[in-house]
């Protein structure tokens, strides 16, 4: 095996069904250094650009400004959500590691669903880790965060962000890559909400009403 091409010979290090505990290190230009880091990659915006055969000078890859094309951010002043995403990951990881379901601070119905999705030996399609993590993030923010100091800080941040964008519509977005099964995550969210709403009709945390908007290019 060529030590200079380790990344290209084995680019995938983790199982899609398990916690991503390793990653390939990338340099400032988004190129692989051929070094494996024994921990999860932090959330960040990376756009790997193929290295040209001839390069006169070394340039650092310029960050992309994410402002939905509205000109709301510039290179000098831009909105960067990655710090709070990484912070949320930390708290969800810590919560996930709690062994006793009675200490999860969720409803018994939610606890049973989590145990099923995390540990059931599915005979057909098994949920990917990223699908379960997306659901866990929504559950943690809804059921756990209101009872913790760190959680309340997240909720305040989300409320302020929503007030700046659209004060009349509280929104929470979950971003998953193409092919990771976003439709399945929507179904899991609906199941979680519906079961709890039926058992707790007076709770404002859960609902039985859903609006599903889908593009016409999904097959």
What are these regions (language model features)?
Residues 97-175:
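Conserved pre-motif I regulatory segment
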Residues 129-136, 184, 188, 217-218:
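A structural signal for well-ordered alpha-helical segments within the folded catalytic domains
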Residues 137-139, 184-204:
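Walker A/P-loop NTP-binding motif
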Residues 166-169, 201-207:
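Short helix-terminating capping/connector loops at secondary-structure junctions
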Residues 175-177, 213:
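Generic beta-strand/beta-sheet core signal
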Residues 180-181:
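ATP-binding Walker
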Residues 185, 204-219:
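Conserved Walker A/P-loop ATP-binding site and its immediately adjacent core
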């Amino acid at each position: 095996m060529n030590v200079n091409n380790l990344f290209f010979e084995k680019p995938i290090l983790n199982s899609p069904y398990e916690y991503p505990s390793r990653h390939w290190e990338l340099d400032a230009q988004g190129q692989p250094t051929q070094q494996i880091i024994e921990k999860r990659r932090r959330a960040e915006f990376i756009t790997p650009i193929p290295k040209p055969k001839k390069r006169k000078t070394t340039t650092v890859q310029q960050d992309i400004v994410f402002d939905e094309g509205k000109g709301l951010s510039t290179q000098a002043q831009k909105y960067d959500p990655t710090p709070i995403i990484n912070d949320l990951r930390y708290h969800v990881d810590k919560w996930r590691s709690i062994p006793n379901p009675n200490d999860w601070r969720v409803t018994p119905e939610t606890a049973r669903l989590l145990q099923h999705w995390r540990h059931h030996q599915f005979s057909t399609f098994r949920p990917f880790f990223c699908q379960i993590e997306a659901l866990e993030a929504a559950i943690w923010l809804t059921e756990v965060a209101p009872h913790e100091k760190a959680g309340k800080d997240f909720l305040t941040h989300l409320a302020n962000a929503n007030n700046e964008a659209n004060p009349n519509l509280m929104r929470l977005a979950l971003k998953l890559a193409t092919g990771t099964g976003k439709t399945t995550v929507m179904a899991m969210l609906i199941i979680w909400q519906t079961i709890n709403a039926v058992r707790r009709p007076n709770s404002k945390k859960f609902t039985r009403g859903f609006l599903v908007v889908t593009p016409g290019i999904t097959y």
